[in-house]
Design a protein with these regions (language model features):
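Extreme N-terminal leader/targeting segments of oxidoreductases
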Residues: 6, 13-41, 56-60, 458-473
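Glycine-rich Rossmann-fold phosphate-binding loop(s) that bind the pyrophosphate
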Residues: 45-47
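N-terminal FAD cofactor-binding segment of flavoenzymes
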Residues: 76-115
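Glycine-rich FAD pyrophosphate-binding loop
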Residues: 58-77
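FAD/FMN-dependent oxidoreductases across multiple families
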Residues: 101, 268-353, 359-370, 377
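C-terminal helical "tail/cap" subdomain of flavin- and related membrane-associated enzymes
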Residues: 355-473
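Predominantly flavin-linked oxidoreductase catalytic cores and closely associated redox partners
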Residues: 149-290
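Short beta-strand to alpha-helix junction loop
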Residues: 127-148, 270-275
Length: 473
């Protein structure tokens, strides 16, 4: 049973970075501060990874500077969290605050155009039953909460500062940044953490960024009011709708709005010949089940946005005086909502590496090698399923879930983000993969057509350009 959720107040939806608050002091133009400020760690980017790392390191008594190019609250896509996030918010002391702003998310619903039923999977069905839910959140609220938490723990947090250059030497790094009022400053840091997200600051600097050869996708997205929702416990579940050119996310938020996006093949988005809002409407029309849920819905702020170049990685994520965290290192696809979890968990893992680099240099190299392996593990485990999520064989697995040899429990553990602990899911996940190959081999024509179509669809067609295009880096 679906119900309609009305927002109590008209929600704001502004993809551009929030305008600076008016300041009665005169605007400075091209002011250069000659003093060089010293710090132990300079963090680039005040999103989930950067703010978490800054808070944890400041708690240790480190002198931490956190530079965020925007001003919180600022919009960011990626509003769905995983149950594995809950423990991280506990460790940060922020669980109650997240509970207050989040919509409880107990599972995921799958809707296929080729099946006459839907499937709802709950996180309580995972191998470890102790992580039964997560939240859907407005990232503007959550990211600001994490940023202010870093401030509260002693980090020197600054907004409106864009890092322009980082020069490394044997003792650390010289970091130059510009404020959005024109002021320029220089910091001398013993260690640098790049948490710049899709700006991939250090990866670009070292020419380490690589397009993912196995995946390529683009997205259209907007927020809707008055969209239909599930009843009771099902209200906050994310829904994945497959359609001819990819899949849709459907994320109910606590204020009554619903975040909806189409993740599609680049060639489909590049075929657009009309305004992005109209193209999004045409795309939604390709999914009748989604059309039904939006029959009385209205687009918030009349705004739809597009983003391209979703998938990339980097050749490395660590160096003698730096680390790359979260999306600053790699990003694959948002289908399993893994981005925020991987970013925050990488911040927790970074603490021991930074501590060794600053205090026990002889141990740092081994810890950095371990960190490199860790940073590749999460995206690798999710990617195997992400690369195949639009394949008809994988779609059958999701639409007819079975649990022989605990394969369903293992899959739900993966979807919950339970990939770094001691939960023994790996044998069952290997069984899923074996079953996938056997079923695919049993349908050679279907498998061949799906493979050739995917190879054609993931071709690199160049950067996405046009109106309302964001993060096209």
């Amino acid at each position: 049973m679906l119900k309609r959720r009305f927002p109590a107040v008209a929600p704001e939806f502004n993809l551009t970075l929030r305008m600076n608050i008016l300041d009665p002091t005169p605007v400075r133009s091209h002011v250069v501060t000659t003093d060089v400020e010293a710090c132990d760690v300079l963090v680039i980017g005040g999103g989930p990874a950067g703010s978490t790392a800054a808070a944890l390191l400041a708690q240790q008594g480190r002198k931490v500077v956190l530079l965020e190019k925007a001003h919180h609250p600022r919009f960011h896509i990626g509003e769905s969290l995983l149950p594995a996030n809950v423990a991280l918010f506990d460790r940060l002391g922020l669980r109650e605050q997240i509970e207050a702003i989040g919509m409880p998310k107990y599972g995921v619903e799958f809707v296929s155009p080729d099946h006459d039923h839907t499937v709802a999977l709950e996180f309580s069905e995972a191998w470890d039953k102790s992580m039964p839910y997560a939240w859907q959140v407005r990232r503007s609220e959550m990211d600001e909460m994490l940023f202010r938490n870093a401030t509260a723990h002693g980090a020197d947090t600054r907004e409106g500062w864009r890092v322009r250059n980082v020069d490394f030497d044997a003792d650390g790094a010289t970091v130059q940044a510009t404020h959005d009022d024109g002021e320029k400053r220089t910091w001398r840091a013993r260690f640098v953490i790049d948490a710049s997200g899709r700006d991939t600051f250090l990866s670009n600097k070292f020419k380490a960024k690589q397009k993912n050869p196995k995946h390529n996708s683009s997205a259209l997205f907007g927020h809707f009011a008055n969209a239909l929702r599930g009843e009771g416990k099902l209200e906050g579940n994310i829904t994945i709708f497959w359609f001819a050119h990819g899949w849709f996310w459907y994320i109910p938020l606590a204020d009554g709005t619903t975040s909806i996006g189409a993740v599609c093949w680049p060639h489909y988005l590049k075929s657009r010949t009309k305004p992005v809002k109209d193209f999004f409407a045409d795309t939604i029309a390709l999914c009748p089940q989604l059309v039904e849920r939006l029959k009385d819905a209205t687009l918030v702020d009349d705004a739809v946005y597009a983003t391209g170049n979703y998938s990339y990685t980097s050749t490395h994520c660590s160096g003698e005086r730096y680390l790359m965290l979260g999306d600053a290192f790699t990003f694959v696809d948002p289908v399993f909502s893994s981005g925020v979890y991987l970013a925050m968990h990488s911040a927790f893992e970074s603490v021991d590496v930074v501590t060794a680099a600053l205090e026990r240099p002889a141990q740092a190299a081994a810890l950095m090698q371990r960190f490199e392996r860790y940073m590749r593990k999460g995206p690798r485990e999710f990617s195997w399923f992400i690369f195949r999520v639009t394949n008809p064989t994988m779609r059958e697995f999701f639409m007819y879930p079975q649990n022989p040899m605990r394969v369903k429990e293992a899959l739900m553990s993966l979807l919950a983000g339970d990939i770094y602990g001691k939960t023994p899911i790996w044998r069952s996940l290997r069984i899923i993969k074996t079953m996938y190959w056997l079923v695919s081999a049993g349908h050679p024509r279907r498998t061949w057509l799906a493979w050739t179509r995917r190879r054609r669809n993931i071709r690199d067609l160049g950067p996405l350009v046009g109106e309302n295009v964001v993060d096209a880096k």
